[in-house]
Each structure stands twice: as structure tokens, then as C-alpha cells.
């Protein structure tokens, strides 16, 4: 009597064959829907694209080569860009060349800065540090140049001390500016002392810089020759003149801001009671001023009053520095100015203090000024 041969159940065999087919069919349907989503975006049918994604929430809005965000930037399609950001598109997503959406927006030139570059930067600031396969960041494509933290070290012996002091000073400035501009004034539960005024801050900064320069000069007097001592005294006089001009400009800017705030406060009250044209010393930072205390283009402390031509502002900064004969001191001075007017640092530090509708104009001027300073620094190498 022979044993019957084992047989595979018919249902199990059919199930094992159908599973890969159903998985492949599901993947194919999803890819077709994603292609349809991209076609709707390209044709400007944004309502249909949004409805498709609502019916099928599992679709990948970043799928495709180039990705939809890159296509919207290349076509200057601002509505499609806004829709993609609302639907959760990732500005840090890279295409086959390693470019992010910020790379694509930066390549469209100055016209795309406000409508494309700034929304992407606000959504994902960390994407500014992503490099493509050519080793470029979005800031380098815009011509901002690398931040000073990644620049090559100078060969002078005091370069490391200067860098450490600058980083420490920058951290203190950021903390003090947050207090001065009133970020925490709205918290009524913490009654603190009055914040330091802008003029007091600028005077203290000038004093600290002067003390540091005096200390360096005293340390170097023993090793320098008499001709070098004469050159150092001229450089010191130049620095004193620069500090005096900086303090005067800071006081003038503070007076101008004070008058502007007083005018806006008077307009808000409907001229119910007369007020002097200038606020008293206790009205430098009125509490509850709201958006009336935000900067406009003319309120930014430009090197030249009211801004103007970037080349002229850069030339004015260079003219206030050490003479051309002192190459080392002039390079150090230009490095400080490059850090102060670098677009990344400026945007990180002062974005919340500038009117939204003025942000594009201000950042355009800061970018042009930074590029002009970079050219002056390159000319000294």
C-alpha cells in the first residue's frame, strides 16, 4: 500500500502567487498618482492637486526628479511653492545632483529671493549648510561666501586670540541685543531692571574694544622698533576716530528711532493729548509698542546714513579702518566687518526686529554690502 504524495493546498498556492502581484500593483498605483499630482502642479491646477493628496494621504510630495519644490522654483511658480510647503514638502530634500530647493531658488537670481528663497529658509534654516555634489551651499551660489567660521586661518601669531575674543564678544552682543530690543519685555511676571540703552551699549562696546587695543599695544611696545611705534600711534588715532564716528552715528540713529516711536505712539492715541516731538530718556523702549518698534529700511544702522550704494558703504567702512600700509591691521578690521555684515548672521540676529515687508529690501542691501566687503578683502591677499 503506497502513501499518497503530499499536495500543497490550492488556496495557499494562489495566495503566495497573488501577494507579490498585489504589492506591485499597489506600488504602481501610488507612482501613477504621484505623477498625476506633479502634472496638476505643472498645469497650475492646485485645487485638484490638493484634493488628490487629501484622498490619498500616503503619497510622497517630494517624489520625482527633479522634486516638485525644485520645479516650482525653476518655473517661478510661487503659489505651487506655498502649496507644497503647506502639504509638508521638505526643503532639505536633495535631487540627483545633491541640490536642495534652496539651491534651486538661489540659482534664479535676486528676483526669486523674496518669494522663493526666504520662505524656504524660514521653513528649514538648517538646509543652508547642505552642500551639493559640487561642494556648494545655497549661500555660496548667492555670492555670500562662506561664514567666517570656515575661512582659512591667518598666519599671524595673534590670529587665534583675535578669533576667540571675537566669538566671545559676538555671543555677548546677541544676548544683549535680545534684551535691548525688548524680546522679553512682554513677560509681566518678571520685573527686571531697565535694559541697557542703545547708546550705552555702543559706548561700552567702544570702551572694551579700546581697552583691548591698548593692552595689545602695550604688549607689543617692547618688541617693536621705533618706526613701528610711530605707525602704531597713527593706527591708534585712526581707531579712536572710528570709535567716535560710530558713537555719533549710534546716537543719531537712537534719536531717529525715538522720534519715530513717539510719532507712531501719538498717531495710535489719535492725538488725544499733545506730546513732545522727542521722547524723554525713560521712553527709549516703550512697553507694549507692538510692531511700531520694528525697523524699516532707514532704521538699520548702515555705514552711511539711510543706506545707499553698497560699494559706497563698503568704501566708507574701509576708509574708517587702518591705512593701507598696515596690511595686517586692515585685514583684521575687514574680518570684523565681514562677520558683522554677513547675511546669515544678520538674518539670524535681526530678522525679528525688521518689518516683514522690508525684509527683502534690507537683506538685498546687506547681501550686496557683504559681497563688496568680500571683494575688498580679496584685493588685500
Curated annotation (Swiss-Prot):
<feature type="compositionally biased region" description="Basic and acidic residues">
    <location>
        <begin position="238"/>
        <end position="287"/>
    </location>
</feature>
<feature type="region of interest" description="Disordered">
    <location>
        <begin position="129"/>
        <end position="167"/>
    </location>
</feature>
<dbReference type="GO" id="GO:0032720">
    <property type="term" value="P:negative regulation of tumor necrosis factor production"/>
</dbReference>
<comment type="subunit">
    <text>Interacts with CACTIN (via N-terminal domain); the interaction occurs in a proinflammatory-independent manner.</text>
</comment>
<dbReference type="GO" id="GO:0071222">
    <property type="term" value="P:cellular response to lipopolysaccharide"/>
</dbReference>
<comment type="function">
    <text>Involved in the regulation of innate immune response. Acts as negative regulator of Toll-like receptor and interferon-regulatory factor (IRF) signaling pathways. Contributes to the negative regulation of transcriptional activation of NF-kappa-B target genes in response to endogenous proinflammatory stimuli.</text>
</comment>
<dbReference type="InterPro" id="IPR036770">
    <property type="entry name" value="Ankyrin_rpt-contain_sf"/>
</dbReference>
<feature type="compositionally biased region" description="Basic and acidic residues">
    <location>
        <begin position="218"/>
        <end position="228"/>
    </location>
</feature>
<dbReference type="GO" id="GO:0140416">
    <property type="term" value="F:transcription regulator inhibitor activity"/>
</dbReference>
<feature type="repeat" description="ANK 1">
    <location>
        <begin position="64"/>
        <end position="93"/>
    </location>
</feature>
<keyword id="KW-0539">Nucleus</keyword>
<dbReference type="GO" id="GO:0031665">
    <property type="term" value="P:negative regulation of lipopolysaccharide-mediated signaling pathway"/>
</dbReference>
<dbReference type="GO" id="GO:0034122">
    <property type="term" value="P:negative regulation of toll-like receptor signaling pathway"/>
</dbReference>
<feature type="region of interest" description="Disordered">
    <location>
        <begin position="186"/>
        <end position="294"/>
    </location>
</feature>
<dbReference type="InterPro" id="IPR038753">
    <property type="entry name" value="NFKBIL1"/>
</dbReference>
<feature type="compositionally biased region" description="Acidic residues">
    <location>
        <begin position="150"/>
        <end position="159"/>
    </location>
</feature>
<dbReference type="GO" id="GO:0032088">
    <property type="term" value="P:negative regulation of NF-kappaB transcription factor activity"/>
</dbReference>
<keyword id="KW-0597">Phosphoprotein</keyword>
<keyword id="KW-0040">ANK repeat</keyword>
<dbReference type="GO" id="GO:0005654">
    <property type="term" value="C:nucleoplasm"/>
</dbReference>
<dbReference type="GO" id="GO:0043124">
    <property type="term" value="P:negative regulation of canonical NF-kappaB signal transduction"/>
</dbReference>
<protein>
    <recommendedName>
        <fullName>NF-kappa-B inhibitor-like protein 1</fullName>
    </recommendedName>
</protein>
<feature type="repeat" description="ANK 2">
    <location>
        <begin position="97"/>
        <end position="130"/>
    </location>
</feature>
<feature type="modified residue" description="Phosphoserine">
    <location>
        <position position="150"/>
    </location>
</feature>
<feature type="region of interest" description="Disordered">
    <location>
        <begin position="1"/>
        <end position="34"/>
    </location>
</feature>
<dbReference type="GO" id="GO:0005634">
    <property type="term" value="C:nucleus"/>
</dbReference>
<keyword id="KW-0677">Repeat</keyword>
Amino acid at each position: 500500500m503506497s502513501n499518497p504524495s503530499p499536495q500543497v493546498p490550492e488556496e495557499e498556492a494562489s495566495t503566495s502567487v497573488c501577494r507579490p502581484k498585489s504589492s506591485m500593483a499597489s506600488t504602481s498605483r501610488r507612482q501613477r498618482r504621484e505623477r498625476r499630482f506633479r502634472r496638476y502642479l505643472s498645469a497650475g491646477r492646485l485645487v485638484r492637486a490638493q484634493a488628490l493628496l487629501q484622498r490619498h494621504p500616503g503619497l510622497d510630495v517630494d517624489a520625482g526628479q527633479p522634486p516638485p519644490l525644485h520645479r516650482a522654483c525653476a518655473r517661478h511658480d510661487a503659489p505651487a511653492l506655498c502649496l507644497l510647503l503647506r502639504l509638508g514638502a521638505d526643503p532639505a530634500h536633495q535631487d540627483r545632483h545633491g541640490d536642495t530647493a534652496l539651491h534651486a531658488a538661489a540659482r534664479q537670481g535676486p528676483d526669486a529671493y523674496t518669494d522663493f528663497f526666504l520662505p524656504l529658509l524660514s521653513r528649514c534654516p538648517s538646509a543652508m549648510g547642505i552642500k551639493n555634489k559640487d561642494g556648494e551651499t545655497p549661500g555660496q551660489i548667492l555670492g555670500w561666501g562662506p561664514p567666517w567660521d570656515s575661512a582659512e586661518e591667518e598666519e599671524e601669531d595673534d590670529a587665534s586670540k583675535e578669533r576667540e575674543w571675537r566669538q566671545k564678544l559676538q555671543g555677548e552682543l546677541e544676548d544683549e541685543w535680545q534684551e535691548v530690543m525688548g524680546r522679553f519685555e512682554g513677560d509681566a511676571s518678571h520685573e527686571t531692571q531697565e535694559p541697557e540703552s542703545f547708546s550705552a551699549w555702543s559706548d561700552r562696546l567702544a570702551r572694551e574694544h579700546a581697552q583691548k587695543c591698548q593692552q595689545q599695544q602695550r604688549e607689543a611696545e617692547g618688541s617693536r622698533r621705533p618706526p613701528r611705534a610711530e605707525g602704531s600711534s597713527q593706527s591708534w588715532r585712526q581707531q579712536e576716530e572710528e570709535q567716535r564716528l560710530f558713537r555719533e552715528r549710534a546716537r543719531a540713529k537712537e534719536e531717529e528711532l525715538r522720534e519715530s516711536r513717539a510719532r507712531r505712539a501719538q498717531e495710535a492715541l489719535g492725538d488725544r493729548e499733545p506730546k513732545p516731538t522727542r521722547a524723554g530718556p525713560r521712553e527709549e523702549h516703550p512697553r507694549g509698542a507692538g510692531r511700531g518698534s520694528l525697523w524699516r529700511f532707514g532704521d538699520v544702522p548702515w555705514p552711511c546714513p539711510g543706506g545707499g550704494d553698497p560699494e559706497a558703504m563698503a568704501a566708507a567702512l574701509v576708509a574708517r579702518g587702518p591705512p593701507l600700509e598696515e596690511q595686517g591691521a586692515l585685514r583684521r578690521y575687514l574680518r570684523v566687518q565681514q562677520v558683522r555684515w554677513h547675511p546669515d548672521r544678520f538674518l539670524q540676529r535681526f530678522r525679528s526686529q525688521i518689518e516683514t515687508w522690508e525684509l527683502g529690501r534690507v537683506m538685498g542691501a546687506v547681501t550686496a554690502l557683504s559681497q563688496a566687503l568680500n571683494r575688498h578683502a580679496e584685493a588685500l591677499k
